[in-house]
Every structure is written in structure tokens, then in C-alpha cells.
Amino acid sequence: MASINKKLFSHLNVEDSDPVWEKFAEVEFSKKNIFSDNKAYLVEDGLVRKYYINNTSDIDTEVCAEFYFPGDIFTVGTHGSEGIFESISSGLAWEITLDEVKEMFVVNPECRFVQNYYLSRKLNAAMKREMLLLKNTPQDLYEYLLSHKPHYIQNIPLKYLASYIGVTPISLSRIRKRIS
């Protein structure tokens, strides 16, 4: 049986000997896998996207909201309420039920530190993304990703990247052509 690469998740500040690691179950996933509801995941390998279905027009469209790379953690709540989590590539994750996470908070108050850290990171990232979307053009957003998050450009398929910055794939191609 494989074990979690704890160094990859050292930013969570959980001791290597902490029994919490034993509660995670290994999940190998393939491309286009939809992750189960009411669980938290640690991504060890692969790439996962979070998206919403926009059905305000005649055609349903997918709007990419976030991406998760190795070392990231994400939680999936009730189906559809918080978006859909789908793998972009095959990979490996570690899962734990949200009920088990709640139990850990009761048994071990130190887990609250991890929760607070995770929530503050999520809030800061959401606020930063909102400001980027409000204050910048799609070309500015693409240039920001080029300079600050090149791993997005290198790893995320263009159709998902276009959705993330709020343009069509054709518009993204034009932006890329103007920049180069």
C-alpha cells in the first residue's frame, strides 16, 4: 500500500507522526473523473479543475473556477452546490470524508489550525481572483498568468484556460497571437 507524500503537504503543518494521515484513503483517478461528494482530497499527482454549469442561455456552458495541482487540497460538498470537480489528467489523490474531518476537530483542537490556514488561503485566493477579474482585461489576465502562474499556461488545456479568464478559445488564441 502506498503512503502519502507528506513533504508535498508540509505547508499544512501536520506532524509526520500525526494519526490524521492514517485516515486518508488512496484514490487513483483517470482523466475526466468526477470526485465524490462530501469528501476532502489531497492532490498528490495530476490536475483537477472545478467548474460550474452556466445554463442561463439556450446552450449549457462550463465555466472554470479553479484548478488544483499536486500539493493542493480541495473539498467537495453536496453535489452541484459548490461546483463540479473533474480531473484533467490521471493522477493520485488521498480522500477523507467530511464527517471524519469534523470528528478530528472535536478530538484534536490542533486540527483547527489546519482548517484556519486552509480557509484563509482559499479566501485570499478568491479575493485576489475577483479583483483580477474586475480590474483587468482578458489579455491582462493571460499576461498575469504568464508571469505569476506559468504552470497554469504549461499544464491546463487552452479550452479550460479560456473559460477561466472568461473568453472563448478563439479569443484566447487571438490574445496569444498578439502577445507573441
Which residues does each PLM region occupy?
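Cyclic-nucleotide recognition modules
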Residues: 62-117
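A short beta-loop-beta micro-motif enriched in histidine and acidic residues
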Residues: 30-40, 60-61, 79-81
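Tight coil/turn sites that cap or link beta-strands
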Residues: 27, 32, 68-71
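Phosphate-/nucleic-acid-contacting segments
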Residues: 136, 143-180
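Cyclic nucleotide-binding regulatory module and flanking cytosolic helices
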Residues: 1-28
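Short, Lys/Arg-enriched anionic-surface-contact patches
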Residues: 65, 70, 79, 128-141
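Glycine- and acidic-residue-biased ligand/ion/polar-headgroup-sensing regions
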Residues: 38-55, 71
